[in-house]
């Protein structure tokens, strides 16, 4: 695959998943159009790594300025939220409200479409942010700032692959939602996405942490994926864009916890 093609697809993925001011490419003249998921699926973990790198730079910079690890972790997570425009956090809140507050499929989907945040969504957001900050702070304490930064980069990459694989594993829960408009990836596109994410995990975590940590990094997103597949499949009979976003949030938390539990060398 040509480097120019990879660069074009990476930019398209970053435009969709972040607020970075990137120009439209040749294949996507409309910067606000939804890109073809089958085309950019393999580039989504790469986009996640770029987004994670922004948080990692903020983390290392804050720690280099002698800020406390807790504050540095808060700033890093804040940078990630600002970079993505709380894209996945919004999906987490909507999913928590819908799955937690609805009595049947129709009501759950209606609640998820409501832009207002309810009790379940608010609690999910608070807990998710706390868990990300706490896990990052603990990683800084146990592994050092540079290894914690590496883990953050890989977590953001691998967790986005989990969201893509959810779209592949389940049918759209409704015909007119974001999950349907973004498209359902083909098996080959999903496999390419998973392989790129796995490659990033191995290439970065094995030298930085060791084989056991890399293995945990491979398993963690799958644990989050299967948990969200089971929950979403049972309660709404499929997937939505919100559930894919929630899967990314759950996956990044489980990933960071996995690295903490299996710290390697």
Curated annotation (Swiss-Prot):
Signal peptide: none annotated. The chain crosses the membrane at residues 40-60, 67-87, 121-141, 150-170, 191-211, 213-233, 243-263. Its cofactor is Mg(2+). It catalyses: alpha-ribazole + adenosylcob(III)inamide-GDP = adenosylcob(III)alamin + GMP + H(+); alpha-ribazole 5'-phosphate + adenosylcob(III)inamide-GDP = adenosylcob(III)alamin 5'-phosphate + GMP + H(+). GO terms for cellular component: plasma membrane. Its EC number is 2.7.8.26. It is found in: Cell inner membrane. GO terms for biological process: cobalamin biosynthetic process. It is a multi-pass membrane protein. It comes from the Bacteria. Pathway: Cofactor biosynthesis; adenosylcobalamin biosynthesis; adenosylcobalamin from cob(II)yrinate a,c-diamide: step 7/7. Keywords: Cell inner membrane, Cell membrane, Cobalamin biosynthesis, Magnesium, Membrane, Transferase, Transmembrane, Transmembrane helix. InterPro entries: CobS. PANTHER family: ADENOSYLCOBINAMIDE-GDP RIBAZOLETRANSFERASE. Belongs to the CobS family. This is Adenosylcobinamide-GDP ribazoletransferase. It comes from Xanthobacter autotrophicus (strain ATCC BAA-1158 / Py2). The lineage of its organism: Bacteria, Pseudomonadati, Pseudomonadota, Alphaproteobacteria, Hyphomicrobiales. The gene is cobS.
